[in-house]
């Protein structure tokens, strides 16, 4: 059999490999200290669970969900305005994802041609590199160093790389360093992107899990952000919905639109009960988010 050459550049996900090792140890009765994927162990609120159950009882919920529910997109818009002070167009700037991981894996297929350069932070979440590799793109790693508080230094990116780069991924609050980006950093990122015609993809999964009185903001809060980029956000960390795969892509209309077109050829939308549970998460009592944050901070301390 002859398989795609792109698979030569892809290895099995590190999380899958580690999970296999964990299962082997469990079968042998050996102790396991699991520092792998970091799946949240705090369950969703009962209100979220109840909405999901009730929707799952409805026969119509099992039809194709080709289009995102209008009320889901409106809930995203309301949440982004209330939480981040960001205004979104409900029709053109919001897209449901089957988890932000799915969107991050597919976005390079929508933005890149083979041989294009993608700028990713280093160290970073594995899919940041895997997605571009699937698209045939080349990776340039932007170092995050302790001496700069783990903030990318755009002036250290070589001129020839910047000239050729198609898009770059930012991820703050950062996984794995925990760094939080400053206002000045985002302003520099947007200016850099405009100077070199580079699109920005911001991964904002951890904005609600910020400790010590600090604030996690949206990249889209900053002037000019929508001109150059999009943001992915997750329900896994804030609402404990890691297994109910749901995420969002918001921001630049053209970038959201091209990802929507790609996804229309890949899947037929998200299971309606999960969309409705996500609506409850975004529009319901947000105390669960604060309680979750406090729990994680207590564990850290």
Segments and roles (model prediction):
Residues 90, 109-170, 191:
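PLP-dependent aminotransferase-like
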Residues 116, 137, 195-199, 225-227:
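A short helix->loop->beta-strand "cap" motif at the edges of active sites that frequently abuts
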Residues 25-28, 135, 195-196:
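Helix C-cap/helix->beta junction micro-motif
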Residues 145-214:
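Active-site phosphate-binding strand-loop segment of PLP-dependent enzymes
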Residues 224-297:
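Conserved core segment of the aminotransferase class I/II
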Residues 2-99, 106, 281-284:
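N-terminal small-domain helix-loop-helix segment of the aminotransferase-like
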